[in-house]
Amino acid sequence: MESIILRRVRMILAIFIVIVTTASPLYAIDGNNRFFAYGVGQRSCQDYIKFREKRLESLEQQYERYTKDELYEIVDKIVEHWIAGFLTAHDLYVADTYNIAGNTSMNDIKARLETICRANGKQYFAEAVITLVQQLNPQRVKADTGK
């Protein structure tokens, strides 16, 4: 009799632990509140502002075969893809979120990131994107509408 009760208590406790751990928000940061960003996310907001202002002098010197407009288009696509990857990862790993950007266009996202970066040019670009995601959260699409 005692072993049946003990098994049930263990089962209930196991179910409770599974529910609690899966319902908790997931933060990919270490104990010191730090994280590692790849690619564009490692750049500073000052670099992003330079890019938005089409100040690509160092790239122009490094890649003379491209025009300034061609370089801007290349960098623009790299930045867009990095942002899209970040937002996709967010959608995958955050509960109750199907599409964090909702109806926000990529151009609007980039403009909002510029505003965030102008407020703190020394922060990493990844931090600016995190700030943007926090701003977008209230208007996120929570579930697939099936359209």
Residue ranges and their predicted role:
Residues 113-117:
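Individual transmembrane alpha-helices with interfacial aromatic-anchor signatures
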Residues 24-28:
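Sec/Tat signal peptide C-region and signal peptidase I cleavage site
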